Amino acid sequence: MAVKVGINGFGRIGRIVLRNAIIHGDIDVVAINDPFIDLEYMVYMFKYDSTHGVFKGSVEIKDGKLVIEGKPIVVYGERDPANIQWGAAGADYVVESTGVFTTQEKAELHLKGGAKKVVISAPSADAPMFVCGVNLDKYDPKYTVVSNASCTTNCLAPLGKVIHDNYTIVEGLMTTVHATTATQKTVDGPSNKDWRGGRGAGANIIPSSTGAAKAVGKVIPSLNGKLTGMAFRVPTPDVSVVDLVVRIEKGASYEEIKETIKKASQTPELKGILNYTDDQVVSTDFTGDSASSTFDAQGGISLNGNFVKLVSWYDNEWGYSARVCDLVSYIAAQDAKA
């Protein structure tokens, strides 16, 4: 039976989670809340997407609801999560994709309106974090709020796990060359907390902070304190790439490491999550790719048997949203068994 889901926040991730839910098949989005978009604009924003193209199915308004492919979706415009009537719409699970309510306490406000569980589509300071293919076995049905971590952590963690399981990571540094996101400025503008982040997104390569590498230590405890990293924001609309440099305990040639990753990508745990390519790829080749991470065999290099650079691509919108759907589906299945 399909999982009944509500989406709070109909921005980039909210809309692409909905597109993925339609493809996913066992997720039924029954409600959307966004106080900043009216229903007509919601239809337009969902149908037309500069990055992922025009939605090919039917999108219309009927009886005050958003109707996609004939399925009605209740639309709310509440600013306070506690006031959203998820229960009345039949939504058991809420995808919290505003980027605002990312703590356990704030996300739990959704429960007041009748939701049973909340999945935050962002890293959280205190909610348990899960990465598909890495630590789903640690999920406990008693959790009411969970985080799907970040798009970059979803790219890095499966790759890091394979390397750590086979060669033991001593320490490492990650750089993500990251596509522009909605929080950036089209031209120079005020950004008090991050001065460089306020510079025009289309005109600059912008160094930025990211907690993605440190967060790997939360989903793989044996890597805690062994990884950190930074980001460069670049003027592309979508698709990012992780550059991971690690020192490994068990020496291996780059060819051996490639073969290990290739084999791991074909296992049931990582199939479709960690992909492998030998092709001469560039970023746009991954637009709309649903994998969390695609290892670029031609992109990496090793200095010696213990020091290696690994490169892995990810569609930071589409791939991440696919994992949000997978996580919702997984926890619903576990909850049903509890």
Swiss-Prot record:
Top-rank lineage group of the source organism: Eukaryota
Enzyme category, top tier: oxidoreductase
Listed InterPro entries: GlycerAld/Erythrose_P_DH, GlycerAld_3-P_DH_AS, GlycerAld_3-P_DH_cat, GlycerAld_3-P_DH_NAD(P)-bd, Glyceraldehyde-3-P_DH_1, NAD(P)-bd_dom_sf
Subcellular location: Cytoplasm
Key word Disulfide bond present: no
Main location: cytoplasm
GO cellular component, as recorded: cytosol
Stretches that traverse the bilayer: none
Annotated site location: Activates thiol group during catalysis: 178
Metabolic or biological pathway, per its Swiss-Prot or TrEMBL entry: Carbohydrate degradation; glycolysis; pyruvate from D-glyceraldehyde 3-phosphate: step 1/5
EC number of the protein: 1.2.1.12
Active site: 151
Reactions it catalyzes: D-glyceraldehyde 3-phosphate + phosphate + NAD(+) = (2R)-3-phospho-glyceroyl phosphate + NADH + H(+)
Residues binding D-glyceraldehyde 3-phosphate: 150-152, 181, 210-211, 233
Alphabetically ordered keywords of this record: Cytoplasm, Glycolysis, NAD, Oxidoreductase
Gene Ontology MF annotations: glyceraldehyde-3-phosphate dehydrogenase (NAD+) (phosphorylating) activity; NAD binding; NADP binding
A Pfam short name: Gp_dh_N
CDD domains in UniProt: GAPDH_I_C, GAPDH_I_N
Protein family membership: Belongs to the glyceraldehyde-3-phosphate dehydrogenase family.
Assembly with partners or alone: Homotetramer.
Protein name: Glyceraldehyde-3-phosphate dehydrogenase
Species for this entry: Phaffia rhodozyma
